[in-house]
Amino acid sequence: HRMLGDNVLHPIGWDAFGLPAENAAIENKLSPKDWTNSNIKNMREQLKSMGFSYDWDREISTCSENYYKWEQWFFIELYKKNLVYKKESLVNWDPIDNTVLANEQVIDGKGWRSGADIQKKKISQWFLKTTSYSEDLLGDLTELEGHWPDNVVTMQKNWIGESDGAELSFKTLINEDIVVFTTRPDTLFGVSFICIAADHSFIEKCNIDIKAYCENLLNKESNNKEQGSPEGLFTGIYAIHPMTKKQIPIWVANYVLTGYGTGAVMGVPAHDQRDYNFALKYDLEIIKVISNDDTDAEVYTGNGKLINSSIFNNLDSKIAVKSILDFIVEKNVGKSVKNYKLRDWGISRQRYWGCPIPIIYREDGEILPVDETELPIKLPDDIDFSKGGNPLENHPTWKYTKCKKTGLNAIRETDTLDTFFESSWYQSRFCSPNDDKSMIGDEANYWLPVDIYI
């Protein structure tokens, strides 16, 4: 591209935080900082000896305080706009590395580095509200059509996974509603059971045997897959069908995906293959509500005329979708919604070698970001890995601080940011690497947006 006359930015940098560096440092009895900087020094010398035409004046390292200062500043800006939050969440827990793993880091049910059997565990995690941008992300894919391979655009659309449907509220005999998501409200009268995910909040209302079953189910690899044989357990609790007022059983099932929709689905075995397989296995009622003269299949998933559907009988199923939606909205038992497979991004990790999250927990119960004048919040150098896990959690002084605004005692957040957080923005920092007044300075305007990024 230089030979074609284009201005080419060819920088070099080091994606230097993370679990691999931390583990390697521990194995070599060095601090992660010394281990990482030593490796960077060696690699820099090797690359320079090869004569690559990198712009070394733009060199950055993600573990540099000058770099992660702006990452912390950005986190605080997101916090101010309510785009980051903390909640208890079911995660992939590596019992050897003592940290959360992303789904991509779990291979055949085992940790990608440790080889440990991954456990499902609920812990408090920080999340980035990527779901707030689901519609924008999907819409912007149209700008790639004709410029990117069709399979890449399709893959992205499927990853975001937009679904039009409805949320319906089912009352239960223990006075707690269960909300289900469905893309087929026209099959509402065919519901003969409800299935919930093993981590659904409703499980807390169940007996100890159900809770133990769910814990075991969550630790099975099959729980994260849509394929495989159906498996479930009756909770002993019934819901009330919002239309027919019949009692329908509530089951835990392995084919209800955790983290998608509401974590609860309505079982319509005559018109959904998974529901049908589940109903056959556990001898549950099968109610046909859509007829089609062209097929006598046990499971019909297409369109047709409604039957066994009260006042909606004989309606075409496509028309019935709107009619039933209007009815449930009028009766205040449901609403029309868009759902997405895209989930909010869990960005915190229970390890030392990462960017400190600039949050404090004040003694009066307030959770708030540090004052921006305190940035960067630096990692301590005097760390002890002998106790295992995250040494920040056990540090005798670093985690204890005071709120600058009130003077009240506070404890620092001891989780650090996922390394993908660092690598999500360094391409922009390359364009103004030495700016000490802003995350991305005016110098970047010359380069951004780029025509080609490799």
Segments and roles (model prediction):
Residues 130-163, 191, 196-233, 373-402:
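Amphipathic alpha-helical
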